[in-house]
């Protein structure tokens, strides 16, 4: 077991950046290997590390274990606060521990040491009169009550997931950590990420840029360089899996590098709603407000989840006003243009519009290829451009779908012991490609666009040229080129036998105007989301 872990650690150290290795892999320790059940238990020192390693590195560790023992190995992660102190070279295999459940219960803050139980009716010690004994008992009872109250407050604070301001300030005063720093500062790094909830892997360096997201990336970099000054708030919107969350984590990580003492918090809108409810139940709104109003950077993801939640919106409005007044930066993401989010108070919508709103579009072909090539490289796999282009051409919706497809291809190749070719890719993605081809057709595009612009489907094939017909027809041609595998001549034939040059002109015209016309861009975004279901 220890030989394997030394081998595994050495490989991961070569594959990962120094920051990733020191932060996530080095604190782990193997604690048990059950040869009969083919299970390996690995301990992590805290819940945050355990959850992250489990989600990001368990697959790679399982692969290395299978290669090492020449058998499928189930890797289980367990919690052990002393994991980072273990020495793999001298570790003694322990009995296998039960794996932790997948749910993430709220962390329990360590309370003060339990006060000794007080028996008010116990006889007084020798030499102590009854009055003195009663006074001592009363003092002990008060001390116990105070300890219990402190423990209760600590539990509630942990459940609310609000790091204390004193913890923030203390860490800010002593923190000198940078990515790749020595082990002495790894504890400070852990503390930073646990408080901020930032994902240190999501940076500007590994964000693939193309026409679809270059404006959003430029705005994000500007905000990271000048928080609270350039664009406040910065509002990013777009479909699922297009990189909104990656970008806002990148901003937070960049600010931590530039200003290690900055008070930063990433939170999903659902968690914010949950915290508001808990604060209301516990009458802890003073703590809630003090925490959120004191931040330097608030990153709130998927704000559409605030829809219909008036108390949450009210609290967020006050937090927003306080942060902006203090020149703190607010960054928000949504799946929809701000004014299109239903169930949100008008005064919040007006605040969203007061900064910069930027759309992130589905990646274009070249960008999808670049994403696949980079992801394959990070997995230590050589992927030919032919295969990358094939996958990128057939899967168009978002980055997560591309990465999921690549994982299927890699697993299929490894399982069958075959080289990754276009033929193998077709086999691996057979079901996915069938669904994609069935979902979107030119006929469906024509009907959807006609309904959207209130014209007849027959107008798509006609020779009529009024602007209210010609424009939707050009948009339908553009979407047919973007969302189907049809060639230009095939698309032209389906639009009333038009020449392929007519289709090409329409595609180029709409693509060019999309980058300049915010209203057109929004309409296309709505149509694309509708067609993709």
Swiss-Prot record:
Pro residues bias spans: 96-110
A Gene Ontology biological process term: DNA replication initiation
KW Nucleotide-binding (keyword) present: yes
Main location (coarse class): cytoplasm
Family the entry assigns: Belongs to the DnaA family.
Region (Domain III, AAA+ region): 197-413
Name of the protein: Chromosomal replication initiator protein DnaA
Taxonomic lineage: Bacteria, Pseudomonadati, Pseudomonadota, Betaproteobacteria, Burkholderiales
PANTHER family: CHROMOSOMAL REPLICATION INITIATOR PROTEIN DNAA
Gene3D superfamilies membership: 1.10.1750.10, 1.10.8.60, 3.30.300.180, P-loop containing nucleotide triphosphate hydrolases
């Amino acid at each position: 077991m220890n030989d394997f872990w030394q081998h595994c650690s050495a490989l991961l150290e070569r594959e990962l950046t120094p920051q990733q290795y020191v932060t996530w892999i080095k604190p782990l320790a193997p604690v048990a290997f059950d040869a009969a059940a083919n299970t390996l238990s690995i301990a992590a020192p805290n819940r945050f590390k355990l959850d992250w390693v489990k989600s990001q590195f368990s697959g790679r560790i399982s692969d290395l274990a299978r290669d090492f023992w020449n058998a499928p190995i189930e890797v289980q992660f367990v919690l052990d606060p002393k994991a980072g102190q273990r020495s793999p070279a001298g570790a003694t295999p322990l009995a296998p521990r039960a794996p932790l459940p997948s749910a993430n219960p709220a962390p329990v803050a360590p309370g003060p040491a339990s006060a000794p139980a007080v028996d008010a009716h116990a006889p007084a010690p020798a030499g102590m009169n009854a009055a003195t004994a009663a006074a001592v008992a009363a003092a002990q009872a008060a001390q116990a009550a105070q300890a219990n109250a402190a423990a209760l407050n600590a539990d509630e604070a942990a459940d609310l997931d609000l790091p204390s301001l004193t913890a923030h300030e203390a860490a800010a005063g002593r923190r000198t950590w940078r990515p790749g720093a020595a082990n002495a500062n790894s504890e400070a790094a852990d503390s930073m990420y646990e408080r901020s909830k930032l994902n240190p892997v999501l940076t500007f360096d590994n964000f693939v840029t193309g026409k679809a997201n270059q404006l959003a990336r430029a705005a994000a970099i500007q905000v990271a360089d000048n928080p609270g000054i350039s664009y406040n708030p910065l509002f990013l919107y777009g479909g699922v899996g297009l990189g909104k969350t990656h970008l806002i984590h990148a901003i937070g990580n960049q600010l931590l590098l530039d200003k290690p003492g900055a008070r930063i918090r990433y939170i999903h809108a659902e968690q914010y709603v949950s915290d508001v409810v808990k604060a209301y139940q516990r009458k802890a709104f003073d703590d809630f407000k003090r925490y959120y109003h004191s931040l330097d950077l608030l990153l709130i993801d998927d704000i559409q989840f605030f829809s219909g939640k008036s108390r949450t919106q009210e609290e967020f409005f006050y937090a927003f006003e306080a942060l902006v007044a203090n020149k703190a930066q607010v960054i928000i993401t949504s799946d929809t243009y701000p004014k299109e989010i239903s169930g949100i108070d008008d005064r919040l919508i007006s605040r969203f519009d007061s900064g910069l709103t930027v759309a992130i579009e589905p990646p274009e072909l070249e960008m999808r290829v670049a994403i696949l090539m980079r992801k394959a490289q990070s997995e230590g796999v050589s992927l030919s451009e032919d295969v990358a282009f094939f996958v990128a051409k057939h899967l168009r919706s978002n980055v997560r779908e591309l990465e999921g497809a690549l994982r299927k291809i890699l697993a299929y190749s490894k399982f069958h012991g075959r080289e990754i070719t276009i033929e193998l890719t077709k086999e691996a993605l057979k079901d996915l490609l069938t669904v994609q081809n069935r979902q979107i057709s030119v006929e469906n595009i024509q009907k959807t666009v006609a309904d959207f612009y209130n014209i007849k489907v027959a107008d798509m094939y006609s020779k009529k040229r009024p602007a209210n017909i010609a424009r939707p027809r050009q948009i339908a041609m553009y979407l047919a080129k973007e969302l189907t595998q049809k060639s230009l001549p095939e698309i032209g034939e389906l639009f009333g036998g038009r020449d392929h040059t007519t289709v090409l002109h329409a595609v180029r015209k709409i693509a060019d105007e999309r980058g300049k016309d915010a209203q057109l861009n929004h309409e296309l975004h709505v149509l694309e989301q509708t067609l993709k279901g």
